[in-house]
């Protein structure tokens, strides 16, 4: 129990120390998946005259997914209206080819067009066009990557979704909303006191978080569109670890109002909380199962922190993690198949993934200070924070751990990542 308290204190306070904020990230992909589709993304005709290199963003998205391997296009610029020499691209080792163009419209917006080709069969697999502002050029590239990913893998792409993370610079904490690749970050809120545990609402319109501005942890929700916030939990003692129910109507929170850290459910608009379990152990870090029937959480009721599951109505809990003696920070994949968590192994904190149906556990990383895992909405990637080369960094990994991408800046550290849901287009 004492070790768990020390770990929670470390997560809440010491772990928030960061270097200056990152303005941009550099994507570094490492590892090789078992099956990677070779794809060539040619330079879009006209892209040299616009602020964003559309083709480069598309290729980086696809490679970061672990499902694709980029084929060198040697500077070829092909527009979507020209049928490519498919035999040539087969010789280059590509199975698929992306061509496109970008041009300025009379109203100042940009016309972005693309087409996807199966060069093995010589088939046109379709394309789309977008009329976007300069600010949305990157978004158009992410949407192109989404189209390609879904067309070639059958799974929905998550490149046009968003993530959150927290930074600290000069005694100033900030919660950021960024593209899924870490770029295009916008400050959502700032405080001289720590901000922790950001959690997206199921529709992506709100972010629940914990602020220490009252000199103790208090739970708020932040409206992403308007910037308005609502007080959710400011009861006696600690208020922490908010988690949204799948329907967005309820938040599970950890409160110490009745002594010790216990799990409660509270209306998403605030109100009187309802205690979920009656016991004397420390229960914290709740997360809802995608079907809304169960809550996963961390408890020391067995003597050391492990992950448990119980019905949302409360009552008896069953232990879920059995590999390792110290397991925290549960995250459930949106498809309900995987549980990501942090396990202490020989003093190091490492990301693991448990397949819930089989009980098979996979060690994802070889780093030593992983934290805060969060699944992409298509369940194919995990974003997490870790320490690499002496400082904190944001990483993504495939669920098998074979491909990782480091979103690294020249200066600065980032913490507490969270992956948002699919957005309506």
From Swiss-Prot:
Gene3D superfamilies: TolB, C-terminal domain (2.120.10.30), TolB, N-terminal domain (3.40.50.10070)
Protein name: Tol-Pal system protein TolB
Pfam family, any one: PD40
Signal sequence bounds: 1-23
Entry similarity comment: Belongs to the TolB family.
Gene Ontology CC annotation, any one: periplasmic space
InterPro entries for the chain: 6-blade_b-propeller_TolB-like, PD40, Tol-Pal_TolB, TolB_N
Annotated source species: Albidiferax ferrireducens (strain ATCC BAA-621 / DSM 15236 / T118) (Rhodoferax ferrireducens)
